[in-house]
Amino acid sequence: MWQVKRALSGQCQTLLGVLLLSAALIIHSAQIGGAAKAQPRLEPGVGEVNSAEAVNENGRGNVARRLPRSVFHVRWNPNEKFVVESRESPAINSSKLAPHPRLKVSKNTKLTLSPKLYLCHDKYSELCHNKTQQFRQRIVQTFEKSMSESFNDSQPNPYHVDYKPVFGDSFEEQYYPSTCLVMEAGVRVLRRKDKPFDKVPFGRLFPRQKLFRNIKNIKTCAIVSSAGSLAGSKLGRFIDTHDIVMRFNHAPTQGHEVDVGSKTTIRVVNSQVVTKPEFDFAHAPIFRNVTIAAWDPGKYNGTLEDWLTSADYDLFSNYEIYRRRYPKSRAFLIDPHSVWRLWQTLQMFAGNRSIRRNPPSSGFIGLALLLPHCPQVDFVEYIPSTRLNGRCHYYSKEMNAACTFGSWHPLAAEKLMTLDMNTADDMSVFQFGILRIRRPDKLLCGFNFFGY
């Protein structure tokens, strides 16, 4: 009897040992599987977006890690088209159509830094990481300096700006998320039902359509600045993969496709371009077959009735000619009240530092117009990269650092606020020239500073 009990005890011990061993093997397998799933996925850089080659600066094909939040990622799915076709016919344009607008810029035309000293491409190199951080610091310092020098009480106030903080000293407005501030500015185009346009013949010129078609299908948008640092960037293919591509004024694509792409969905144009004869807004091919969003600031507290009779530049005459010439065109006017609400967001972001009492630039207006419609916006060369060369535009040879760092528009405040909204890594922004902004969740926003 004792021998039987001993045999049974031995069998139980053996079975228990087998169970423990099996459990250990299962746990070990799970750990290996989890580690495999946690293995970071390599994201290609700019060169790979353009050439589809996964080889970095030092010739290494396989790299063990990646920098987080990289803008550049290619989904290798043979069933997907890499280049997304435009829903609009491409604009036929040329840099020879017209000279660039005459803007008020500073006399300081020289760069105060040497960007080439910070240029690198190996995002896994510690040296490149350090160079990128140093360049970022120099750029931010330059913007901060420009902001500190941008305003004094003796400067003219042609737009009669009389800003009062929403909450005075009792609330730190600058702590509110920047993306929410931009969204809540509500930059919009005027509609036929808006007063006083619902009762005047001019209002019938406004298109009945919405600003963008098929909004539910819009996933990614690119805003292409006109910066001189786009020259030689080879970002054209990357730009053209986006569902919506926004450009400004008369910035051409023809002859610059490798750097800026060929696709154009919408152009944001200022009232100078609409008005001045050298731009030939009503007839130039560059303004056809694309959506147009034209803007003029008007006075800070002026009414729309005042704006109709005293716009900065009388864009209404040429707008009417354009709409009557092309009745099926999608040409809109941006609400000037919303432009000044956007200026208020910049002042909120700046806090106790006063910014220039001039309207935001077309670039910042374009961002605010696009962000509510697009989950992800890539802003190309708005924040200068190490390709910074001092040129105003990629299509001209004019040299003036004020085009980048600001002198009339509150450009420094705009770019610091845009950097605050950025979700891409520093390598993407300061080496490759791509800043990424994601549309905020509605639950994050909703404070409604402006009460409109």
PLM region spans:
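Metal-ion/cofactor- or nucleotide/acyl-coenzyme-handling active-site neighborhoods
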Residues: 2-452
